[in-house]
């Protein structure tokens, strides 16, 4: 969707970093002990070794829980990560917020092997048999280095539902909230750089004490489209809310993002939790290393992890526990190749059965996204295709941490239930009854203002119009997905990609809601508030897409995932045969093994799961260490 900053800009950014301090100082920060002042002290050399805890996956949850276990004195901790530093393996692209749409398109070749696994789905019935690239972070930071950086929490009722599903009230809003706050280092908006008509509202009482490692803030740049969109949302009946961190979502707000408040670089679990943990003498990372299999003793206790570093095989032994944080696709995959999963699947691949858990890989839930687009009489990220504008934007970003490159494409997030009378007119009785099962505060649709062109989402960079116009879109995402997918294995070898079947848009309720959501996006562009800035009629898909059948057809062709895959190692009560982990994230049927990532969610809360993944990691770390 956006061009790469100029080579001079990229080199300038690197030169600034190099001149300021050696790499070790940059990563460790002030106050690091002399004994750990060399970067290599925190990175393991391949070979058989023993630790108290072995964490598989250096992603969003993995680095958070590993860092906390080391910090809280639980013992020695090793982290296994298949990738390396995204700052080195992806140029500036992963660090600059405005470049978050690189290598995330549906096309199977729109991926970058330095930071992405290159996974793709099996052909999707809900998308006319299309298989899609599904971006997943293969780097330190995992998908927190690949996501769109939105930081927002689910609703109070969604966490209450979680608590009820797993039989543990520690997941109810009031009890779970401290673990959200624990991660945060919140910085208020810089109004001087954000400009006019971009005032934010937030509740500081739910944003922690500022001692957490994870920087959350507002972008230093607000696209003009957002200020007009705010008026349009008000016209649609969506009131301004306080920052979406207090367990309430219905309404609109400028979004908070995981961005470094000083540099406007992406904040990930690597730049936050890992960099803090590098100073701990009981912490070690094995990067560029693939976990092949979890090993169990005769009592079904997880005792070690078999690894592969560029063909060299070795084992890390865990005295206390193995923590699996490989994500919604690879956590179930690794369980299955290790002998934990549906017995029939394991038998098919000749894998000795350790524990028959039929729920492993099932219950996959996800959010989809799509958008109509207009030409607008405003500066949007489309302007970055103009060389003069891009050069100035490059200077603004690298010299002042300002300008459009500091903006992660979306400014305002908004949520709603389809309002009456359109609800009765657009949705069938069956769909309305199904949606009535969700609590009153649980939204059905999310809106995201986007300063750019969306299109079919095959390849944002390649497909961005270069006709000199500025484009804006209103993306919509479904918050009540009822379609259920699954993850399975194609081989007993963890190096062979898993079989990913999100099963998007296979439930009729999802399909009806998807059509209604598209109509609401058109309502947005039809407001009187936006008339002064729209140029012509709807550009994409255009007025030829008019009937419900045509809208459904268009949605099926144009939607993509927003990369919220979850629930494939679902948490539940121990008596539930489909549950994979209990409320302490312990794998049912074996000992000394936990799953801590989005795969352990019992259900997908509305909105963006990043904050909940961090909170879950914080909570389970405290459960393990007992030192919180």
From Swiss-Prot:
Cofactor(s), names only, from the UniProt record: FAD
InterPro entries: FAD/NAD-bd_sf, GMC_OxRdtase, GMC_OxRdtase_N, GMC_OxRtase_C
Pfam families listed in its UniProt record: GMC_oxred_C, GMC_oxred_N
Main location: cytoplasm
Biotechnology: Patulin was originally used as an antibiotic and specifically trialed to be used against the common cold, but it is no longer used for that purpose since it has been shown to induce immunological, neurological and gastrointestinal effects. Genotoxic effects of patulin with dose-dependent increase in DNA strand breaks in brain, liver and kidneys have been detected in mice. However, more recently, it has been proposed that patulin might also have anti-tumor properties.
Keywords: Cell wall, Cytoplasm, FAD, Flavoprotein, Glycoprotein, Oxidoreductase, Secreted, Signal, Vacuole
One Gene Ontology molecular-function label: flavin adenine dinucleotide binding
An example Gene Ontology biological process: patulin biosynthetic process
A cellular component term, taken from the record's GO annotations: extracellular matrix
Reaction(s) catalysed (UniProt annotation): (E)-ascladiol + A = patulin + AH2
SUPFAM superfamilies reported in the protein's UniProt record: FAD-linked reductases, C-terminal domain, FAD/NAD(P)-binding domain
Chain sites annotated for binding FAD: 60-61, 81-82, 147-150, 598, 609-610
Pathway noted in the entry: Mycotoxin biosynthesis; patulin biosynthesis
Entry protein name: Patulin synthase
Glycosylation sites: 48, 92, 197, 260, 386, 429, 486
Active-site feature positions: 564 (proton acceptor)
Subcellular location field: Cytoplasm, Cell cortex; Vacuole; Secreted; Secreted, Cell wall
Quaternary structure annotation from Swiss-Prot or TrEMBL: Homodimer.
Similarity field: Belongs to the GMC oxidoreductase family.
Enzyme Commission number: 1.1.-.-
Function of the protein: Patulin synthase; part of the gene cluster that mediates the biosynthesis of patulin, an acetate-derived tetraketide mycotoxin produced by several fungal species that shows antimicrobial properties against several bacteria. PatE catalyzes the last step of the pathway which is the conversion of E-ascladiol to patulin. The pathway begins with the synthesis of 6-methylsalicylic acid by the polyketide synthase (PKS) patK via condensation of acetate and malonate units.
Signal sequence, start to end: 1-20
